[in-house]
Amino acid sequence: MAENFWLINSNRSRIKRFSKNNQNKDKFFEYMFIDSGRILGVLGKEPPLMTTREELKVYKARDEWRKLIAQGWRRTKPVWEEY
């Protein structure tokens, strides 16, 4: 299972999951998925509703991570069961 890295926004309503795309066919570049979602109800009671998925080259995903951190997003661990 691939390792996932999670960010949560400052008001704890949105979540992003960064994960490496191990099924990528490109021989020259590595890619990551960025899944975005909304937190429903109380954080930790239900898994987030994942709404979108992007696939970016790793260096662009790192840029996105840094941009989100600068905007106040924080690293978090999932507090819900794996789904």
What are these model-predicted stretches?
Residues 1-83:
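Terminus-proximal functional modules
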